[in-house]
């Protein structure tokens, strides 16, 4: 961005948003399979709509998992437990259509079967990682607080503080920047699905008091901050009844809220051999450690692949002018300390574990969870040593 003073907006959605229901189903199936078969190839897509969950994809595995049961238990855990919502775990129809992974793809991924000996990338493509020092978790402030709102909406719904809430919901946070640094919260937008017999005034007041005020530090909010709560006046029909949900439709909320770049590939339902997911996690790991090391205030890492080839075809580092050393020097350090070969990324980040369902809502990045190994900052000292800072 050329402007130094500007507004920037990011959004998040709750676990009951139809697209996120689909993501969680896809990743729940992946978790169940990877628990039994570490070598499985999974590409699992989900569609949810009124009274129906449809799962299709390409899965090659030696294990057997009860996909309909996984679908229903995931929906139940989210909170769709009443047929009046138009989508209910116990009564919705479940349809599956699963094929095996194409052998033409498999021979490029499986070690020793294609043109190259090493495990190759599962597809061509470009992936990005991003980090900045705006928040304690090295995420941009707008998406950081947007996720905190949606997590809080789910929390107060599930613990009974706001019993009138239903699972679907969205948030949007606009941050005012001054000289490229966050200054204040300009606008907060919340859409929260609710029971039909609740007044608008109660919904608005309750969300401001029990969600917004519990999420934002008072120094970021002022008398000019604008609130838009359920700004149509009513949000009763929601979830898969209100909108058809599909896996992979929330890739910006999944990543950095529109800051930085995105290669276009989604994450959910994909096993770790898919570089859309694994290389994006690795690029975040690299970017976060660079910023945590103090080498730059903001950094973006791009990596790209050819299908069946282990080594990336390109690696790019951009510090947006904030680097303490030149970007080409940072790239040299990255090449020395990190490997972007699929097998090495999977090993370093320990991705052959059933950890993916919890990545499927509230962001894949900026989470303080030990299972999110790509969020560790354990490479800070080696980076500092090579950077000479």
Swiss-Prot record:
Quick one: which residues bind Mg(2+)?
19
| Entries under InterPro entries matching the protein | ADOMET_SYNTHASE_CS, S-AdoMet_synt_C, S-AdoMet_synt_central, S-AdoMet_synt_N, S-AdoMet_synthetase, S-AdoMet_synthetase_sfam
Asked if the Swiss-Prot or TrEMBL record annotates the protein with the keyword NADP, the reply is: no
Name the EC number(s).
2.5.1.6
Gene3D superfamilies according to UniProt? 3.30.300.10
The UniProt record gives the binding positions of K(+) as: 45
Residue numbers spanned by region Flexible loop: 101-111
Q: How is the cofactor bound?
A: Binds 2 divalent ions per subunit. Binds 1 potassium ion per subunit.
Family annotation (PANTHER family):
S-ADENOSYLMETHIONINE SYNTHETASE (PTHR11964)
Q: What does the UniProt function comment say about this protein?
A: Catalyzes the formation of S-adenosylmethionine (AdoMet) from methionine and ATP. The overall synthetic reaction is composed of two sequential steps, AdoMet formation and the subsequent tripolyphosphate hydrolysis which occurs prior to release of AdoMet from the enzyme.
Its name, as the record gives it, is S-adenosylmethionine synthase
- Tell me what organism the protein belongs to: Syntrophobacter fumaroxidans (strain DSM 10017 / MPOB)
Q: What lineage, starting at the top, does this entry show?
A: Bacteria, Pseudomonadati, Thermodesulfobacteriota, Syntrophobacteria, Syntrophobacterales
Q: What gene is it encoded by?
A: metK
